[in-house]
């Protein structure tokens, strides 16, 4: 018995079926990441970073951890679905555009001098031990922020939802205005070791349960 198969002159076997079925969906991502990997500086673990990026994308993971890889930069196109990004303890001087889904950003102990536009749903911003001189507008969703050990002179408006702020060892000369109103949020803010010379009267708007730490500043005897 013989079996006749239809002839398809346009058919050809893929050189790598896994790449075509899995990574074909993400070809633009993979191509950009592979190019970025080839531009690695000595000591950077970009091969490990790309491996984690691809795994994150293929598995649709909501967390991407690229910390402690001695990276000097990140690729421009991060996985769009992530809600947590950890790039702490690298050599980063800037960050690319961040996914709009991001809720937690950890980028401590780098060399950042500025931050990109922050995602609208961001809840936690941890960027202590950098070289930041200012901050972008803070999203209303922000709950916790650590900006200690930077070079920040002034703060943007603080979100009403912000519960915990650590701004120790910066160059702040004044505290932000506090407009508590009927907001039930119990706050704990740390402004120790700055250059603050007076306390705004708006601090009296805070609930009794709130704590403002301002030791080791330049407060005068008539600070309030």
What label would you give each PLM region?
Residues 2-89, 94-97, 103-109, 113-117, ...:
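The feature captures the LRR N-terminal capping module
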